[in-house]
């Protein structure tokens, strides 16, 4: 099966995560795709494929003879889609032999403009897959899942030599919890790639890393008639705190 054929199957499975949920996974529906992938992995010969109670899928493709000593190489992608737009009843649109111009999404009339997305011009002549505009497509990151699954199929069909291949599919990446309960030791890879990126052929060898904090600032209210050198404005204190943060360490 081609990678795009798998993608078309996967995007029809509703897997939107929930940023306000306190469960792991944040939505039980993510198990629907997880179980589908476990079955497909087992059919591809990865006999140990399984999904744990928190919706993490793990599987291993053993090394081919003569390559058992190679360090395990991992490939990771996430199954959930962003809650910022609808993720149910996805209707993929296939644009064959794309002409390099603006793309109109038929469900809403929204336009994917080459002015806003200049990289589209590089894709002239290729086949594009988009949403109809009423939902997300879900290629983030079901395209990554499809690519990993297709790689596993090709490695075996073409008898390509390889070391141990470790596969991990995670829930809840879109709400910042994808790695929270990922079992690195159980995964078993010495090195790993996350297949979730930008243009074809691009590799990011480092990533932005940050933590979040909730800061509460308490002011001190004094009658304006006697406030000089006594009143404390919480907003101004918060501004001072914000400006004290290292400028070049901020995401922007």
Label each region the model flagged.
Residues 22-70, 74-76, 80:
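A non-catalytic alpha/beta surface segment that caps or lines the substrate-entry region
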Residues 19, 48, 161-164, 246-252:
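Flexible, glycine/charged-enriched surface loops at secondary-structure junctions
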Residues 67-164, 169:
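Active-site metal-coordination/substrate-binding segment of hydrolases
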Residues 33, 140-147, 234-237:
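Catalytic-loop motifs flanking and including active-site residues across diverse enzymes
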């Amino acid at each position: 099966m081609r990678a795009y054929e798998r993608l078309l199957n996967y995007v029809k499975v509703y897997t939107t995560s929930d940023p306000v949920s306190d469960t792991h996974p944040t939505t039980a529906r993510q198990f629907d795709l997880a179980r589908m992938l476990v079955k497909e992995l087992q059919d591809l010969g990865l006999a140990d494929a399984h999904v744990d109670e928190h919706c993490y899928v793990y599987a291993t493709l053993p090394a081919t003879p003569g390559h058992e000593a190679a360090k395990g190489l991992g490939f990771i992608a996430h199954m959930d889609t962003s809650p910022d737009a609808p993720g149910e009843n996805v209707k993929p649109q296939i644009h064959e032999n794309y002409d390099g111009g603006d793309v109109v999404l038929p469900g809403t009339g929204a336009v994917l403009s080459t002015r806003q997305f200049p990289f589209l011009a590089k894709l002239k002549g290729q086949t594009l897959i988009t949403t109809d505009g009423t939902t997300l497509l879900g290629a983030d990151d079901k395209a990554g899942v499809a690519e990993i699954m297709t790689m596993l199929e090709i490695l075996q069909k073409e008898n390509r030599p390889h070391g141990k291949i470790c596969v991990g599919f995670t829930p809840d990446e879109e709400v910042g919890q994808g790695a929270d309960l990922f079992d690195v030791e159980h995964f078993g890879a010495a090195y790993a790639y996350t297949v979730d990126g930008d243009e074809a052929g691009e590799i990011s060898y480092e990533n932005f890393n940050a933590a979040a904090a909730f800061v509460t600032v308490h002011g001190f209210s004094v009658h304006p008639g006697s406030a000089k050198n006594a009143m404390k404005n919480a907003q101004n204190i918060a501004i001072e705190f914000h400006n004290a943060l290292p400028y070049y360490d901020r995401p922007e």
